[in-house]
Amino acid sequence: MVGEMTNNGRIRPSFPVKDLTSNEGSEYGGPVEFTREDVETLLHERIKYKSKYNYKERCENTMDYVKRLRLCIRWFQELELDYAFEQEKLKNAMEMNEKHCADLEVNLKVKEEELNMVIDELRKNFASVQVQLAKEQTEKLAANESLGKEREARIAVESLQAAITEELAKTQGELQTANQRIQAVNDMYKLLQEYNSSLQLYNSKLQGDLDEAHENIKRGEKERTGIVESIGNLKGQFKALQDQLAASKVSQDDVMKQKDELVNEIVSLKVEIQQVKDDRDRHITEIETLQAEATKQNDFKDTINELESKCSVQNKEIEELQDQLVASERKLQVADLSTFEKMNEFEEQKESIMELKGRLEEAELKLIEGEKLRKKLHNTIQELKGNIRVFCRVRPLLSGENSSEEAKTISYPTSLEALGRGIDLLQNGQSHCFTFDKVFVPSASQEDVFVEISQLVQSALDGYKVCIFAYGQTGSGKTYTMMGRPGNPDEKGLIPRCLEQIFQTRQSLRSQGWKYELQVSMLEIYNETIRDLLSTNKEAVRADNGVSPQKYAIKHDASGNTHVVELTVVDVRSSKQVSFLLDHAARNRSVGKTAMNEQSSRSHFVFTLKISGFNESTEQQVQGVLNLIDLAGSERLSKSGSTGDRLKETQAINKSLSSLGDVIFALAKKEDHVPFRNSKLTYLLQPCLGGDSKTLMFVNITPEPSSTGESLCSLRFAARVNACEIGTAHRHVNARPLDYRLSLG
């Protein structure tokens, strides 16, 4: 019990005290309980002596009084520790409840966003059904079913929101209860501090009387300490002997079981031998009787012969059983000897286990050091390769295109220095030779392409800024390279493959103490306007006039980081969640049909992944950024035949790509002024092209002979990019708290 009320209304503490048998409490028979009256009585107690000159009695009474005081003080100290522990426990419970509430709020927000997406999709389906209803009356039933699904989804959303709200209210009630308990504990803690102060004050008055008794107490303490240490050592030895005895008993039990089995087998064999001997004696008696009567009864000769044969067979069986008995006795002797051998083997195995544990610890340390060295060497290799690298990819011929013409237009050198890196383009009888970091032929698979960039993606986990973008004319395979073909796992693009590698690597690095948080944003630049592709507000993504009503401003800070104001940022925990977001963004992206491409991307697509990692053992924090960009395709107005909105889109695309060319040209010439602000695209890519990022460009070209001019322009632009020196990328390591605004650089 915590306490009880006295007549004057004050609380009289009454707490059970643990057995203090290691010290003075052993004289009072175990558990002791104090009340406030007991404490006051003890403090005001006056020691009475039978004789004023009996110093032995005075010393014993004083020591007894001091022991009771020390027991009371010890009780208050343990009580204070219990309250401190309870207070810390309640504080931890409150923090866990607050964290649980925060997690519930985040989950509620994510669920609301997902369900809003579902509702928007259902509304879109319902709108299309309504249009069909006006045209064809026969589809009325399908429209009603779609409306029913939307209502069910809305009811499910409302029920889910109600359940989450109820759980949140319950958690808040638990938090309020915990706060009340903490307040009560604080009040009791103050009361105990007052008691402790009064006891310490009175104890200081008695300190003078205790000086004579201190010497005896110190000697007793030293003796007790020595005894306790001896007991501890003996307990350790006893524990080790118990473990050895238990192991020996296990081995002995196994041997005894084998011995009992062999003894039982020997007894059984002896019984069988005795039975056979009895049968033999009985048959011998019968034979003797028959032989005595043989002269009279010749008819029994056959029976006698049969019995003799049986007797010989039984004699053989007796010999075999005797041999088995001897073998069993030998096995028993071997089992007795194997008991000692097993005990010795157990000790050897125990030593081997300890040695293996030591080797395992050394191997783990070497693994950690090796991982550090791998990261260092990997980043050194990337630096030596250059900050802006260029890969060229030639798409395969489509159906209807002449493969023989492709062989005349594009060729690949076979010399050792240019193998896998060179490409030759033939135009009007003149050959143009280019060399890049890597050239992918049309037969190269998506996996082949990803293997070449996988180490660059690893740099983002190590704390670097990484940018990969695809450039080329419309229809050259940029979107296929970056996104792949939905529904076909073998043709997944670089973006989903990069995310799968990052999630797998994050899982493998957990054993080394690393924890990562990942955040995703997706946007498009359409007609020099930024659109948020993850926004749940449909009007914020696209307006009828092609201009987004939401203004998204690009901001650069002093540290070289870039973020887009008000852009939707989503915390991701799995590659499936990212696939869902990519599908959502693909539905919102601007795509149109032109004379050169059935599904032409009419905007620049920017996928950004911010990576924040923390190592619990080294307390090191890294922050990396991975930008994956699918640029809109360049096209000539004379070939695309664009008019109206398509004409405006083409002009905006060509203008932004021209601004990108101006930036690359200025960087290649190392001019003082680089025109990053000439377009939204170049301003957004400023961190990737400004020297603090590891940047890779894919130049995609088509083998179609009619596109040789555009392919030559793309290859020349790529060669200029490959010649740029933009500086050395830096690893971003710090101990600052996570910034939840997604940075593009």
From Swiss-Prot:
SUPFAM superfamilies: P-loop containing nucleoside triphosphate hydrolases (SSF52540)
A GO BP entry: microtubule-based movement
Residue ranges, annotated region (Globular): 1-35
Annotated spans, Microtubule-binding: 65-77, 198-745
Keywords: ATP-binding, Coiled coil, Cytoplasm, Cytoskeleton, Microtubule, Motor protein, Nucleotide-binding
Region: Disordered, residue numbers: 1-31
Name of the protein this chain belongs to: Kinesin-like protein KIN-14M
This protein's encoding gene: KIN14M
